[in-house]
Structure formats: structure tokens, C-alpha cells
Amino acid sequence: MKKIYLFFCIGALLLTACEDLIDVGYPSNQLGTPQVFEDVQTADAALANVYALVRDRSVLTGGSGIGSCGGSYADELDCYYNDQNGHMDIYQNQLQETNTYISTIWRDSYQQIYYANAVIYGVEQSATLSGDDRNRIKGEALLLRSLLYFYLQQLFGDIPYTASLDYEYNRTIGKTKAAILLEQLETDVTEATVLLEDDYRDAERIYPNRKAAQLLLARIYLTREEWLLAEQTAKKIIQSPLYHYEADIHEVFHKSGKHILWQLKPQNSGDATSEVTLYYFDNSAPHNYALTQHLVDAFPDDDLRKQAWIAEITVNGQSWYRPDKYKNRSNNTNEYSIMFRLEEVYFIMAEALARQNKVDEALPYLNASRERAGLVPFTSLPAEEFHKELRVEKRREFFAEFAHRFLDLKRWGELDELSALKPNWEEYKHVWPLPQSELLMNPNLYPQNTGY
């Protein structure tokens, strides 16, 4: 049954998508597909479709994914949606378990987790793939799966963790405690760092390598407060000759930069990134999102990021601010959606060192983004002041990128500070409600998160 269902799902993956993941339902057609994982081209095609789904339909999409929903849930983005999909409820911190948007995020992300599991199982069972191909494909699938799990855990708290293709098991699985899940992700991503090579399999860095896996591992270490391991892992990336800190503020979001660890290519040649499609407005009020005044005011006027990455739009005397990191609306030849960039590694290193009372060693890593932005570098800072400046600087650097702000506030225990700006904020809203549809299908997911 497991092998039959694997063939069904991989066949569907090569064409389109299955239905649910945690509760996928039995396939209506259980005819086996060709042996996908006996050939590296078809195995890569199966994996490529996981990438496409992650790009277009997951919590990680640069469109209506974690970047926008996390940014509006926190204090980066004002929401102007006029729809029935629940975006305004996220922005107003009034989520209910019936919210369509969170149900979609959950369902689509778990679909891709299941497909990643199918790819992992398929290459493990293959008798014909070379060892190098097997390691690479499994390593990439492990990284994709772990990244999806990481964001789902940060949003929902305790969630199901499964590496299984067994239908009956998955449809009744209970939740894994957040601490245990993060420990498991540490194990999974560590395995990915062993399986993957430093060399990229594509010159455009659209597939992750070992260093991309190490970045995620360092992020997990930081989340688990394993400061020394975070420092050691970040150092491996910083010392790699593959990467260089981009000196030109105008080049940071161009696809050819040597500071890029991993990026996602738009579906068609010339397509805009999903970030441009989501955030762009001009000569009118915002349609979807605009930057909050609170965020814009966090930048000094002489900060080059404010000048290069934020566009002010004024209509009839009223001004709004647009995220303008990605700029090409059409005929896009030089922008892909950057998932991981070296600047994050510098911030991980800075925080990990400072947490070990090595502020003097941490200063250069904090100053890197300041100096590129045209700001005066710090020569020395007391520990408490360093942590304050790191929070400010990271907010300026990573606004509207994959909810860095939300994740940071959560890790620092500072989410409740949102109550000064967001009148509906309450302490229990550190996590989102589990979707009602999932609870009804699988009562083992109870209890619902506190407050919902």
C-alpha cells in the first residue's frame, strides 16, 4: 500500500498536486506510475515540482505567504485587502480557527511536506540512482521539508511531525511539542548538511547547497539558544570562498550577487518576482499592503536602505510607502526571490557572539549592514545597548522578507510589545489557531491552541 500510494503521489506530483496531506484521502486511481526514481532526470523532475509548489503555494511563497502575513500580523505592513480570504483578520490580530487563509497555509504546506517525504522515500528505495544523486536529492528534500516545518511551528506552536507515507498513521497523528520538533529539525537539517555538497548544481543558485542547509541549521540553533553552535555554524558560511558581502545597496536584490545562498526563480522567463506582484502600487492607494509608518520612521533619513528599498507614493496629498526591494514588473532579467542571503548569517553571528558576552567580536557583523547603508559604524557598545541596536538594525535590513521581524520578536520574547501599536493584541496570540477543518478531520490534534 505504501509503495502504491507513493507511485500515485509522485505521478500526481509530476503533473499537478494531491488533495490534503495530513488527511490526504485514498487515491481514486491506484495504478502505479513508472519507476520515477530509477532515473535521475525523472527524480529531479519530481523534486523540481516540490520547489515549484513551495514557490507558488506554500507558507514560503514570496506572494501571500509568511512574508506578508507575518509582516502584517506584526508591525511591518498595513493591510488594504478587501476580500473574504482572511487577510484583514491576520492584520487586525483577530484570527479564528475558521480563517480561510490559515487553513490554506496549513493544507498547502503539509501537501509539500508529504511530497518531500515521497521524494525521500523514493530515492532511499532506488537501486539505480548513483550515490551522489541519491544524496543530493534527499538532502534538498530534507531541507525543503525542514524549512516548511520550521515556519509552521513558529506560526502554530505544537504541530504534527511526520516523515511517513502511511495514510492511516498520518490521518490520526497527534501534535509534537515545539521543543521536540525543533530538536528533530536540528537532526534532519544536520543530515542535509552531510548529504549536500558545497558546490551548487546550478550557477544561478536556485537549488540549495550545503551552506544553505547550514544557514537553516544556524537559525534553528539560534531559536534553541544554542549560541556556540550557532556561532560555529555561521562561521563556516562566512569563511567560505563562495560568498562575499555585497557592498552596493542597489545590487542586494539582483540575482547574480555572491551574497546569495539560495533563491527561487520565477515560473517563466521575464516574470516578476512574487514580491513585486504582491506589493506594487503606484498613482493610487495600496491594493494589498503598504509599509507601516512605524517601520518607515525606524530609518534615519540618510539610511541608504530607506532611499533604495522604500518607495513613497503620494496621491492627493496622502502618502504611503511601498516595499521596493524588488523592482522589475515585466521583462525581469535580474531578480529572483532570495530565500537566504549572507546578511542573515552576519546577524546570526552577531547575536550568537553577543549572547556569549563577546560583544567586541560581534560588532563587525552588526556594522556590516550599517556601513553599507551609509551609517556610521559603532566602535564600542555596552552589552545591553548592543542587543538594542541589533534589533533595530535587523528590522531595517530584513523588512518584508519572510517574516524575519515576527520570528525575531518571538525569539526575543518581545511580541507583546506589539500591543502598543495593535489594539487587538493579546499574549496568547504568539501562536495562531489550528484550522478548524483539520481538527474536525483529526481529533488527535486537539486541544486547540489557548485562547481560540
Please report, for each region that a protein language model flagged, where it lies by residue.
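Long, intrinsically disordered, low-complexity segments
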Residues: C18, Q184, T273-E275, L381-Y452
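Acidic, glycine-rich segments characteristic of secretory precursors and extracytoplasmic regions
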Residues: C18-S68, N442-Y452
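Short, surface-exposed recognition loops and adjoining beta-strand edges that mediate ligand/DNA contacts
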Residues: T33-P34, T61-Y81, E197-V276, S380-E384
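Conserved, well-structured interaction surfaces
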Residues: D44, A52, D83-L155, T193-E197, ...
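Inward-facing hydrophobic residues that define packing positions of alpha-helical scaffold repeats
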Residues: L47, I113-A116, L182, V189, ...
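Hydrophobic-face positions in mid-chain alpha helices that act as interaction patches
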Residues: E231-I338, L342, E397, W432
